């Protein structure tokens, strides 16, 4: 579960490496974000010459969490890190590649584009 001030890795090639959550979108009492939720982030660490710069504010969709997700068959998928993919104003991915695995639950949240860019779908 991701809340305000959480530090996340960036799973795409947009140029950002680490971001910090500054707002969880989705209602006034939405305090934590889970897999597939959209959050507002600030870039804390970026590579030189990338598409994004340190201090920029973007939206992002969470693709991996340490707490994981429980599927209807009872199985649980957990990851070693919290990661997200940065989105532009039109809610499309900024990067052209997604590194690492993503889960099938993104399809239910209408992020098929991220699934097609990912290396592996679990």
Swiss-Prot record:
Keywords: Ribonucleoprotein, Ribosomal protein, RNA-binding, rRNA-binding
Gene Ontology biological process: translation
Recorded superkingdom: Bacteria
Disulfide bonds: none
Keyword Translocase among UniProt keywords: no
Keyword Transmembrane helix: no
SUPFAM superfamilies, per database record: Ribosomal protein L14 (SSF50193)
InterPro entries tied to this protein: Ribosomal_uL14, Ribosomal_uL14_bac-type, Ribosomal_uL14_CS, Ribosomal_uL14_sf
A molecular function (GO) term: structural constituent of ribosome
CDD domains: Ribosomal_uL14
Recorded GO CC terms: cytosolic large ribosomal subunit
Cited function: Binds to 23S rRNA. Forms part of two intersubunit bridges in the 70S ribosome.
Subunit structure: Part of the 50S ribosomal subunit. Forms a cluster with proteins L3 and L19. In the 70S ribosome, L14 and L19 interact and together make contacts with the 16S rRNA in bridges B5 and B8.
Similarity comment text for this entry: Belongs to the universal ribosomal protein uL14 family.
Name under which the protein is recorded: Large ribosomal subunit protein uL14
């Amino acid at each position: 579960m991701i809340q305000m001030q959480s530090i996340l890795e960036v799973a795409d090639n947009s140029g950002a490496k680490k971001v910090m959550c500054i707002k969880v979108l989705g209602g006034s009492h939405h305090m934590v974000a889970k897999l597939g939720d959209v959050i507002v982030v600030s870039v804390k660490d970026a590579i030189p010459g990338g598409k994004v710069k340190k201090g920029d504010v973007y939206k992002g969709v969470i693709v991996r969490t340490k707490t994981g997700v429980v599927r209807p068959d009872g199985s649980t998928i957990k990851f070693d890190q919290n990661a997200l993919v940065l989105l532009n104003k039109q809610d499309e991915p900024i990067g052209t590649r997604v590194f690492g695995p993503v889960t099938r639950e993104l399809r239910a949240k209408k992020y098929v584009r991220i699934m097609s860019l990912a290396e592996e779908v679990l």
